[in-house]
């Protein structure tokens, strides 16, 4: 038997895949270690959503191989751009082949190489049927679906994850109940797009949330990213479900651009006005809503006027956080074939929007100073402090506190990225 380290990249959905592989390897008698130096085999569970991430992972694989480690590559990269994977690796598994991880390790130990990257149409796994080996943290990731219903012209993730496959509400609820019995206090509902959950099996996210919040116990639910075009189909029902106190008043709603022509080129299937309508309705019901959104700058065809509309949108809706991404062409996507903007323009726009979003975040967070808020303590942070989150998922740094406790904290200071508080006696 062998010591194995699993290095996860990317989304929560991918981390859950890593926990499945860890459980399968553990049950097969292998030792899962949490320091890469201890691992005889390193599983690099990759992400391919952006070019910089891809290059970082490729460098990391080379570094591990040069240090004498055996490396097995899993995740989205084998589907999206296998050519960047060092040929010296000991195995390659796609996202639909993670159940073959034991076999891949056996091959590697014999000096052989297992490659299994099936098309998502040819092999389907219900990943809620597999065991999990999760870190003993406060939160537990529950995947609710794999794949999506969009066809964005810039996205290569769909080549790996495929079309939407929603997991049954019964299995999801079963995992949530299990996690709560194990002592987890926070449930992350994860998918490529939680907004389209259930559309393929005759249900939706709001109905699922109602089932989850009906479970007994003191816990909170963090809902993952949802696309506006799907939310529009059941907006009132979703807002109603969000009223339960167990659901964090946190909304990750990516807009990607403030220009309708660019949204059409992206294949996003909604307008800026529809995005703003969702935000308005949520804020009407939840004034303290923690709104996160995403913006891609430098998309092909984005002129100065289109970019300015994105800037104006962010200034108008004032999200708590904006994830600003510089567009990078991904292999096999439609947008990669279009005329690209000069890199210096993309960089300049990214820096400008980043400065604006930091200022907005700072101004919003300053308004929390002096407030007393309920927090869930996550555990030890940096410099001897502890990390916590409010009931709208604002990050708070506290001087002390026990992991998994719900406490009242008074906010004493704030930056653009977190709040600083004191635990009330």
Swiss-Prot record:
Positions of [4Fe-4S] cluster 2 binding: 148, 152, 155
Residues at which [4Fe-4S] cluster 1 binds: 11, 47, 76
Keywords: 4Fe-4S, Iron, Iron-sulfur, Metal-binding, S-adenosyl-L-methionine, Transferase, tRNA processing
Cofactor note: Binds 2 [4Fe-4S] clusters. One cluster is coordinated with 3 cysteines and an exchangeable S-adenosyl-L-methionine.
Entry GO MF terms: 4 iron, 4 sulfur cluster binding; metal ion binding; N6-threonylcarbomyladenosine methylthiotransferase activity; tRNA (N(6)-L-threonylcarbamoyladenosine(37)-C(2))-methylthiotransferase
Catalyzed chemical reaction(s): N(6)-L-threonylcarbamoyladenosine(37) in tRNA + (sulfur carrier)-SH + AH2 + 2 S-adenosyl-L-methionine = 2-methylsulfanyl-N(6)-L-threonylcarbamoyladenosine(37) in tRNA + (sulfur carrier)-H + 5'-deoxyadenosine + L-methionine + A + S-adenosyl-L-homocysteine + 2 H(+)
EC annotation from Swiss-Prot or TrEMBL: 2.8.4.5
Cofactor: [4Fe-4S] cluster
Domain MTTase N-terminal: 2-110
Uppermost EC category: transferase
Residue ranges constituting the TRAM domain according to the UniProt record: 366-425
UniProt xrefs under Pfam families: Radical_SAM (PF04055), TRAM (PF01938), UPF0004 (PF00919)
Membrane-crossing segments per the record: none
Keyword tRNA processing found: yes
Domain Radical SAM core: 133-363
Entry annotated with the keyword Iron-sulfur: yes
Function recorded in the entry: Catalyzes the methylthiolation of N6-threonylcarbamoyladenosine (t(6)A), leading to the formation of 2-methylthio-N6-threonylcarbamoyladenosine (ms(2)t(6)A) at position 37 in tRNAs that read codons beginning with adenine.
Family that this chain belongs to: Belongs to the methylthiotransferase family. CDKAL1 subfamily.
Name recorded for this polypeptide: Probable threonylcarbamoyladenosine tRNA methylthiotransferase
Organism classification: Archaea, Methanobacteriati, Methanobacteriota, Thermococci, Thermococcales
């Amino acid at each position: 038997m062998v010591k194995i380290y699993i290095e996860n990249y990317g989304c929560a959905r991918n981390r859950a895949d890593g926990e499945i592989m860890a459980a399968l390897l553990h049950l097969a008698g292998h030792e899962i270690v949490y320091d890469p130096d201890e691992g005889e085999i390193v599983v690099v569970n990759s992400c391919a959503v952006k070019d910089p991430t891809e290059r970082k992972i490729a460098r990391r694989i080379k570094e591990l191989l040069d240090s004498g480690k055996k490396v097995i590559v899993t995740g989205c990269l084998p589907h999206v751009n296998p050519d960047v994977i060092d040929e010296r690796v000991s195995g390659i598994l796609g996202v639909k082949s993670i159940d073959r991880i034991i076999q891949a390790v056996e091959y590697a130990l014999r000096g052989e190489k297992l490659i299994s990257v099936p098309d998502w149409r040819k092999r389907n796994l219900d990943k809620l049927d597999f065991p999990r080996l999760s870190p003993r943290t406060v939160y537990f990731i529950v995947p609710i679906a794999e794949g999506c219903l969009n066809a964005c012209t810039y996205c290569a993730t769909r080549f790996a994850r495929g079309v939407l496959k929603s997991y049954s509400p019964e299995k999801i609820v079963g995992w949530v109940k299990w996690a709560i019995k194990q002592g987890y206090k926070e449930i992350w509902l994860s998918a490529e797009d939680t907004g389209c959950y259930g559309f393929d099996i005759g249900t939706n996210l709001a109905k699922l949330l109602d089932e989850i919040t009906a479970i007994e116990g003191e816990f909170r639910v963090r809902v993952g990213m949802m696309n506006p075009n799907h939310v529009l189909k059941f907006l009132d029902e979703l807002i109603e479900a969000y009223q339960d106190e167990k659901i964090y008043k946190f909304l990750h709603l990516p807009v990607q651009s403030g220009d309708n022509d660019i949204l059409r080129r992206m294949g996003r299937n909604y307008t800026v006005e529809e995005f703003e309508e969702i935000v308005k309705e949520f804020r009407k019901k939840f004034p303290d809503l923690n709104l996160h959104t995403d913006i891609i700058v430098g998309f092909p065809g984005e002129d100065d006027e289109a970019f300015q509309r994105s800037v104006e949108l962010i200034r108008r809706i004032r999200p708590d956080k904006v994830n600003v991404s510089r567009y990078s062409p991904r292999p096999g996507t439609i947008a990669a074939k279009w005329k690209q903007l000069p890199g210096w323009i993309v960089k300049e726009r990214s820096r400008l929007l980043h400065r604006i979003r930091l200022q907005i975040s700072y101004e919003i967070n300053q308004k929390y100073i002096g407030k007393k808020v309920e927090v869930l303590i996550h555990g030890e942070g940096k410099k001897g402090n502890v990390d916590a989150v409010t009931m709208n998922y604002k990050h708070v740094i506290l001087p002390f506190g026990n992991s998994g406790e719900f406490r009242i904290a008074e906010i004493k200071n704030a930056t653009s990225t977190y709040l600083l508080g004191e635990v009330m006696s």
